[in-house]
Amino acid sequence: MLIKLNDYEKNITQKIKDLKNASGSHSPSIFTMAEQIPELNIKIDSCFLSNPYATALFLRYLKEELIDGQKLRSVLEFYPSQNSIIAKTVADFIGIDPKNVFIGNGAIEIIQAVMHNFVGKKIIVNIPTFSSYYEFAKSETNVVYYQLSKEDNYNLNIEHYLNFVKNENPDSVVLINPNNPDGGYINYEKLRYILSELKYVKNIIIDESFIHFAYENKDYNGINIEYLFKEFHNTIIIKSMSKDFGVAGIRIGYAIMSEDKIRGLLKNGYLWNSSGLSEYFLRLYVRKNFFDEYDKVRREYIQETQTFFRKLSGIKQFKVYPSMANFALVELLDGSSSTDFVAKMLIKYGIYMRTCNDKIGLEGEFIRIASRTLEENDMVLKSICDVFKE
């Protein structure tokens, strides 16, 4: 049944729209929503993208080591290490020269730094994708869009793309892998082939914010492309820790890039850009016992997520696009407005989703649904089925 809003829901929806407009192309946080629209009772956050099981794992360590271990005061009171010191901790763990690792206050800080400092006159950005790569472009940078095909489920047509890049001759290109908002994934061998064909491009930016949710075999083994940097020095690999590890609140990410680029960044204000809590997390991240536990919950989360997507695909009003991330791009097929659907789910069921009507490169009524815990995913599925019965 077509989604319809009553007068009360329309009034709340307008408040939601106003908050969204104030947030630009990003969704307002659940804290902002709750504060500004107290009528809402948000129960499940299916908008923001993180692994809830990894959050629980981190909280357990934080409680045992910092709170119960009486070390939290030190983390809060004393200055954290400088960028290069924390970078060495990560570099030693991933097997990269420390001179090629840069720590960011979230991946978004790294994206902005890269766009402002290294991207020149022209960059190619695939669409639909994460908006910051065109929003952060300098005024003198020509952003050229490469449209991913809806008929191909927004997967990259590699040969067509390579020809497009050759004809445009940019100084920079961006590949988000898996892509946001559709979760499209370029496997290791195909990515390596792309890099080998684009050696003439000055900067190849590879955003791997969701790579821990992708897999290439039935064992869900982790994928590691860091070593490609050793072969292709024009790459800039950006990693967000927020999604994989469910720690968006502490703002942490890192990048792999050439030494001269990092040297330039450190001369321009990134010397002390990590908090004590983010440093604690990164030092925890490189410990074998923690990482082994994380890898176990990562694999379990992937299985639950893919099961969730299969169940979503069984809803006749939906087209669910194949995803190798922890979110699914969903097209509404019954004529319902994506704005009305997202509003109804939030107001009536307390489930916060993301409408994609502000995404450049999408034509139609699209929403993005993040995977949560098994219990939360079941509640989302039940609520969706209920809303279409009204």
From Swiss-Prot:
**Reaction catalysis annotation:** O-phospho-L-serine + H(+) = phosphoethanolamine + CO2
Q: In which pathway does it act?
A: Capsule biogenesis; capsule polysaccharide biosynthesis
Entries under CDD domains matching the protein: AAT_like
One molecular function GO term is: carboxy-lyase activity
- The entry's keywords: Capsule biogenesis/degradation, Decarboxylase, Lyase, Pyridoxal phosphate
Q: Please give the family membership noted in the entry.
A: Belongs to the class-I pyridoxal-phosphate-dependent aminotransferase family.
Name of the protein in its database record: L-serine phosphate decarboxylase Cj1436c
Q: Which organism is it from?
A: Campylobacter jejuni subsp. jejuni serotype O:2 (strain ATCC 700819 / NCTC 11168)
